[in-house]
Regions:
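Sec-dependent N-terminal signal peptides
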Residues: 3-14
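Beta-propeller-forming repeat regions
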Residues: 15-153
Length: 153
């Protein structure tokens, strides 16, 4: 009986494997599975951000927020929730500095940012239950060219 239940559960789990797909309608309207993103998208990555063994979607959007009225690059993270649906895991206003780009790398988000004084940094962030937590600077207080070299490693 236990083997039968396990095999049924395993088959059900495998048949409902979720993938995240970004579809562009035009420059400022995208859909992540069923989730409407009425903003320009500058980056799309997938990977297991929260460590639960399932693929998450990281979408870079350009928009203002309630807490930061200046249009800027933001990071949104989504989880597949069944039947092809996407649900937001984190809709970030800001990481550390002004976000220019990000990459998913070894279970972490690597960011390319500028500070308030115009210097460039590359930083790693990890999932912290709700949102991203700073882990370390890869390089900080540098110029754009050097930061991009570190970011692209």
């Amino acid at each position: 009986m236990r083997v039968t239940i396990f095999l049924w559960w395993l088959a059900a789990t495998m048949s409902t494997a979720q993938t995240m797909e970004l579809r562009r309608v035009h420059d400022s309207l995208y859909y992540l599975n069923d989730w409407r993103l009425p903003y320009p998208v500058y980056q799309f990555q997938t990977g297991d951000v929260d460590g639960d063994g399932r693929e998450d979607a990281m979408v870079g959007v350009v928009k203002s927020t309630r807490y930061d009225p200046v249009k800027g690059r933001r990071l949104f993270i989504f989880k597949a929730s069944g039947q092809g649906k996407a649900r937001p895991l984190w809709l970030g206003t800001r990481l550390g500095g002004r976000l220019h780009d990000f990459r998913y790398r070894n279970g972490r988000i690597r960011s390319l940012e500028t500070t308030d004084d115009g210097r460039w940094v590359v930083a790693d962030y990890r999932w912290a239950g709700f949102g991203m937590a700073f882990e370390r600077f890869v390089v900080k207080g540098t110029d754009r060219k050097t930061a991009k070299e570190y970011f692209n490693q």
